[in-house]
């Protein structure tokens, strides 16, 4: 009798995706982040669901409903901090996942890569709207500042902002719609992740060498299932340590003050995972230019496959490109640091130089270096 997992319509899909999937035999732990992102998404949806049961999306009661969750609901504090820090873990995994794709040339799978860029935008939008929901000072002012950026769009800008706000300022209508979108988007993200996986399985995974691995495949189960479980355990270890020992480490103290439209916080800044983009936004003195740079800081990823000039796919055997890649990582860390600093000397000029270097590395230096490496190898 044929195995049920190979004949049952539903089991067949699971089997071909997670059990009998032919996988390269040499993929390293950098390939674990896809499954970790899946786990993060599940954790976020579950904790978010339980938070939504107790949360009220009204400006008068939102802040106190979050306080109520933390104080009165059984393990409410745990659910709330798992959700807040789960977002941080989500972004850590996302950045490492994208970094892996850039380093090993996984962006050559065009459909998979472009859906990945779309997923990154969707997750960033979801996280931004989620940050508004507790209705603290940073929630309110963050929402005001970021939505206001749309007013830089010529002709329709101010109308667009008022349309998003549902009034003439960030108020009850804004909070209610942000809650609705924050609830629905993770399910759209889950669907997109399914499509992401579908396109990946059309081509098969890339591997560290960047070479075709068709001649040397192994089944996903048990080899990579056990490897993924180890990754998940480490993720849970880091997340629970963060939640139980220092849950507010990555948060902003200002968000423990209820939103007050009459009192602006001294330093308005987003969560740590947006600081690099925020630094790029602030480094351009023109409003529209800043908004364009902000969008392009992520959208530039979609251009990367077309700028691949090397004859080799992976950076594994390209030391000059490796140097530039790690300079890019250092540059992003610098931008993250600058995004959290006040707008004053010397932070302004550091931010501007780091922003220029960011685009210069991706759009100019890396493609030129790849051509130089081809030349060295007489290719």
Swiss-Prot record:
A ubiquinone binds at residue 201. It is a multi-pass membrane protein. Heme b b566 binds at residues 97, 196. One of its GO terms (biological process) is mitochondrial electron transport, ubiquinol to cytochrome c. InterPro entries: Cyt_b/b6_C (IPR005798), Cyt_b/b6_C_sf (IPR036150), Cyt_b/b6_N (IPR005797), Cytb/b6-like_sf (IPR027387), Cytochrome_b (IPR030689), Cytochrome_b_C_euk/bac (IPR048260), Cytochrome_b_N_euk/bac (IPR048259), Di-haem_cyt_TM (IPR016174). Heme 1 (or BL or b562) is low-potential and absorbs at about 562 nm, and heme 2 (or BH or b566) is high-potential and absorbs at about 566 nm. Component of the ubiquinol-cytochrome c reductase complex (complex III or cytochrome b-c1 complex) that is part of the mitochondrial respiratory chain. The b-c1 complex mediates electron transfer from ubiquinol to cytochrome c. Contributes to the generation of a proton gradient across the mitochondrial membrane that is then used for ATP synthesis. This is Cytochrome b.
């Amino acid at each position: 009798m044929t195995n049920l997992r190979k004949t049952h319509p539903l089991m067949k899909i699971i089997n071909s995706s997670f059990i009998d999937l032919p996988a390269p035999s040499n993929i390293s732990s950098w390939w674990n982040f896809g499954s970790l992102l899946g786990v993060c998404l599940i954790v976020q949806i579950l904790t978010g669901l339980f938070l939504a049961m107790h949360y009220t999306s009204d400006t008068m009661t939102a802040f106190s409903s979050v306080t109520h969750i933390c104080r009165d609901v059984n393990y409410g504090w745990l659910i709330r901090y798992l959700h807040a820090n789960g977002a941080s873990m989500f972004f850590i995994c996302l950045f490492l996942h994208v970094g892996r794709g850039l380093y090993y040339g996984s962006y050559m799978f065009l459909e998979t890569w472009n859906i990945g860029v779309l997923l990154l935008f969707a997750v960033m939008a979801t996280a931004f709207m989620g940050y508004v929901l507790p209705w603290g000072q940073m929630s309110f002012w963050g929402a005001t500042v970021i939505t206001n950026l749309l007013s830089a769009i010529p002709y329709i800008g101010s109308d667009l902002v008022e349309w998003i706000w549902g009034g003439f300022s960030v108020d009850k209508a804004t909070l209610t719609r942000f809650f609705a979108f924050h609830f629905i988007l993770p399910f759209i993200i889950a669907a997109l992740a399914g499509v992401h996986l579908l396109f990946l399985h059309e081509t098969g995974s890339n591997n560290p060498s960047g070479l075709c691995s068709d001649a040397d495949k192994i089944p996903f189960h048990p080899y990579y299932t056990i490897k993924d479980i180890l990754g998940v355990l480490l993720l849970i270890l880091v997340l629970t340590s963060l939640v139980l020992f220092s849950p507010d480490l990555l948060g902003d103290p200002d968000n423990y003050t209820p939103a007050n439209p009459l009192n602006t916080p001294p330093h308005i800044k987003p969560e740590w995972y947006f600081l690099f983009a925020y630094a790029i936004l602030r480094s351009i003195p023109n409003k529209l230019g800043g908004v364009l740079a902000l969008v392009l800081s992520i959208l530039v990823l979609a251009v990367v496959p077309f700028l691949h000039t090397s004859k080799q796919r992976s950076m594994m055997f390209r030391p000059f490109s490796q140097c530039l890649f790690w300079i890019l990582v250092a540059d992003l860390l610098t931008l993250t640091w600058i995004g959290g600093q006040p707008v004053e000397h010397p932070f302004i000029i550091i931010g501007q130089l780091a922003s220029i270097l960011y685009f210069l590395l991706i759009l100019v230096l890396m493609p030129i270096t790849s051509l130089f490496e081809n030349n060295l190898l007489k290719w």
